[in-house]
């Protein structure tokens, strides 16, 4: 079984303590989105979980606890774009926090386990094709 944690919210950024507790207890309760009265208990033991994919824009809360994931195969889908606070007001400073976190995560768990997502891409008067091409290259060089 592959756990996608999560496309509904940023679990590493906002709920990492909860996630580590769930992994320690080896289960999670999940409501069926089509029937909120139905709750399933999902086994999270390492012998059942083939892998965990963490989707995040900010893994900082997890960085000091990565050893708690040693029993699991896991990857990070790390979303890093060139948008400023007008688009991403809740993301910490990219230059001071997020990019160093990306680098530390890659060095700690291996760059093959950190997949960079430059997503979403949209265009307007400020965020032009030229802007995205320039800053994609700037980010890639870091």
PLM regions: where:
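Conserved Radical SAM active-site core
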Residues: 1-88, 98, 102-111
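A short acidic (Asp/Glu
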Residues: 63-66, 87-90, 124-132
């Amino acid at each position: 079984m592959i756990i996608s944690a999560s496309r509904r919210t940023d679990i590493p950024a906002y709920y990492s303590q909860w996630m580590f507790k769930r992994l320690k207890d080896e289960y999670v309760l999940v409501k069926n989105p089509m029937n909120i009265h139905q709750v399933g208990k999902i086994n999270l033991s390492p012998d059942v979980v083939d892998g965990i994919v963490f989707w995040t824009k900010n893994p900082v809360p997890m960085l000091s606890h990565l050893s708690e994931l040693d029993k699991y195969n896991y990857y990070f889908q790390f979303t890093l774009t060139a948008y400023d606070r007008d688009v991403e007001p809740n993301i910490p400073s990219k230059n001071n926090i997020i990019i160093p976190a990306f680098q530390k995560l890659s060095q700690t768990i291996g760059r093959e386990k950190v997949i960079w997502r430059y997503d979403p891409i949209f265009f307007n008067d400020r965020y032009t094709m030229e802007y995205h091409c320039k800053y994609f290259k700037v980010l890639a060089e870091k």
